Amino acid sequence: MALVPYVENSLPALSKFHNSSAQFRFANHDLRLAQDWKKHGVAAVVWDAAVVMCMYLELGKVDLKGKEVIELGAGTGLVGIVAALMDAKVTITDREPALDFLSANVKANLPQDSQVSVTVSELTWGEGLERYPAGGFDIVLGADIIYLENTFVPLLQTLDHLCSDTTVVLLACKIRYERDTNFLGMLKKQFSVEEVYYENQRDIHVYKAWKLKQRRDL
């Protein structure tokens, strides 16, 4: 859901993106996410991977309460909003042009007491990483963020910076093309990776990753 160009072959499936909003119920809250495909493109619509990520979070297999969480390529902010509703301290990020739209969705969907635990912040992968604490997050979330090959290396650089040895990375994606599988191969050179959830109707995979332990005797 990062603010980057995207081409989808199944054009009829895109009709839902032209709706002005998308409604969901997660974490015992009714959510209405504004969408604006014409003005903002892919960053301003709710992709299936974000929905499935929220479904996975609701299963309770990852403890979010009080955890330092960062969402990459947040787009409409659905995943970060749900994480905040589940009592995480969340930094929700995307590229600068998406931030006003993202911030508006956060404010519209989070109660005031939850907003204090949320920061909306600019993050272009691989750039300005010193603004974020190295290894400073317990959980990194990303939904539908691995579809452009020229972003793979900076994304991996970003993950390496944000993650400590105990950080859990959760990535939700649809495996559309060979390049998507190639990214997972690149990820496995630096992280242990396992599939933890699959939603058949939407054909979305959720992967859990954590940094490979470095040998201390080298």
Where are these regions (language model features)?
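S-adenosylmethionine-dependent methyltransferases
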Residues: 1-218
